[in-house]
């Protein structure tokens, strides 16, 4: 259901057939995995110009995701994620938060706390920043503890190939796999 376009969004195009198919396959897979009590993980190996950003938002929309975390290995893609969300009519009311620059910039955790919890929130950050560890203590960076405390409806890894096989990424994924195995054994 659309509103009166109070945000003056200008884009109103539909998904292309290949995007619809990717979203449909992912939704079906997620449904089957959840029915079996597993956490779904799905990789889109799509060519450049496929429209993965727009299709990922459409997936989030169809999942009725209210809290979406986008982690990227390539922070330069932030503008594309922000523009797709903030200009398309389908995502009216959705909020985009990210690390901002400048002396007046609010920290991302403050932006999250100030966001309207009644509307979908997309939180964008770099994998290196959000999931990195404090070099002195080896623990979670204090400014990002909140990211790990939220039960995200959907987590998207963008530009996965730029860093997925680095030691920090492998260690994190191994830790997550062990935690999930422990939950399934319970």
Q: Where are these predicted regions, by residue range?
A:
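Walker A/P-loop
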Residues: 34-59
């Amino acid at each position: 259901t659309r509103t009166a376009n109070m945000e003056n969004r200008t884009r109103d195009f539909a998904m292309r057939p290949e995007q619809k198919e990717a979203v449909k396959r992912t939704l079906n897979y997620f449904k089957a995995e959840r029915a079996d009590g597993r956490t779904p993980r799905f990789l889109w190996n799509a060519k450049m110009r496929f429209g993965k950003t727009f299709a990922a938002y459409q997936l989030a929309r169809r999942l009725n995701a209210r809290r979406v975390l986008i982690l990227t290995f390539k922070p330069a893609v932030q503008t594309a994620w922000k523009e797709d969300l903030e200009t398309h009519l389908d995502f009216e009311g959705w909020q985009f938060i990210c690390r901002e620059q400048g002396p007046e910039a609010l920290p991302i955790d403050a932006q999250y706390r100030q966001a309207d919890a009644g509307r979908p929130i997309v939180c964008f950050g770099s994998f290196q920043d959000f999931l990195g560890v404090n070099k002195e203590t080896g623990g979670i960076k204090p400014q990002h503890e909140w990211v790990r405390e939220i039960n995200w409806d959907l987590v998207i890894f963008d530009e996965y190939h730029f860093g997925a096989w680095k030691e920090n990424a492998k260690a994190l994924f191994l830790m997550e796999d062990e935690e999930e195995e422990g939950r399934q054994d319970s």
